[in-house]
Amino acid sequence: MVKNSFISLIPQEEKEENRGSVEFQVFSFTNKIRRLTSHLELHRKDYLSQRGLRKILGKRQRLLAYLSKKNRVRYNKLIGQLDIREPKTR
């Protein structure tokens, strides 16, 4: 597994100021999801990591739903930057 393969999309000065912003939280969850996904490709039966991945996916999904309700422009920009799919609506 390569640790430093993820390039930061948020500039360093913005990271220091906005660690609580929805965009930063979604960005950090996305990095964790990518790391866990690459880990699970090697270790398919690691059920605790699978559970952690599902929990992080749920948190990211809730944050993205919140952001899409509050500010659709920022939501679309973030989805494009992180290259993640828009969730299906029920």
UniProtKB/Swiss-Prot annotation:
Annotated Gene Ontology cellular components are: chloroplast; ribonucleoprotein complex; ribosome
Protein name per Swiss-Prot or TrEMBL: Small ribosomal subunit protein uS15c
Stored NCBIfam families? S15_bact
Compartments where located: Plastid, Chloroplast
Recorded hits in InterPro entries, A to Z, give: Ribosomal_uS15, Ribosomal_uS15_bac-type, uS15_NS1_RNA-bd_sf
Q: Which of UniProt's keywords are assigned here? A: Chloroplast, Plastid, Ribonucleoprotein, Ribosomal protein
Task: Please describe the quaternary structure of this protein.
Answer: Part of the 30S ribosomal subunit.
Which family is this protein grouped under? Belongs to the universal ribosomal protein uS15 family.
